[in-house]
Amino acid sequence: MFITLEGGEGVGKTTQQALLVERLRQEGYACLCTREPGGTALGKTLRELLLHGDPFSPLAELLLYAADRAEHVSKVIAPALAAGQVVVCDRFTDSTLAYQGYGRGLDLEKIRQLNHLATGGLQPHLTLWLDLPPEVGLARAKARDRLEQERLEFHRRVYQGFQALAAAEPQRIVRISAQGSPAEVAARLWSVVEPRLPLATAGREP
């Protein structure tokens, strides 16, 4: 089963990913915990450039994320799924649509085509969207990297993007309120994940 966590800055994805993976392992599931960018050696290099380097043009940024994703799927995600593991990934294709599409204003259909090329059509079985108003998330994040230092209007557009994506695919993308303590949010996530675990099968777009 392939699970992704999505959301804006400061929503607590890293914390919730760790708690979810811990719970899955307690329940006896073999898990892979990974992230984008940064899930491969190439990804770690690109992550440093993308999050802490000088700004790129929107198109260059998009293509770097796609290169990271192609390597990540090929070398990490696809082999783990083939081995029967539950893969839990911090960010995937929906982040590219929200940030580079809605946030940067790049063409959504072209981003979808590039995502499809980079992933070979691989889609998450379940996407957990951690929902938190941008103003609250940015206050939590305290501008730790370049993306978090973007203007509030950019983050509002990203938030609207996640709203639109969730509305378009309600069976896959489930909104989870990120308000409350980490334990409270983790309980909400588990209530969504647990019923879907018996249905875990490898899934690809047609």
Curated annotation (Swiss-Prot):
EC supergroup of this enzyme: transferase
GO cellular component: cytosol
Residues the record lists as binding ATP: G7, G8, E9, G10, V11, G12, K13, T14
Disulfide bridge map: none
Pfam families, per database record: Thymidylate_kin (PF02223)
EC number, UniProt record: 2.7.4.9
InterPro entries attached to this UniProt entry: P-loop_NTPase, Thymidylate_kin-like_dom, Thymidylate_kin_CS, Thymidylate_kinase
Origin superkingdom: Bacteria
CDD domains: TMPK
Name of this chain's protein: Thymidylate kinase
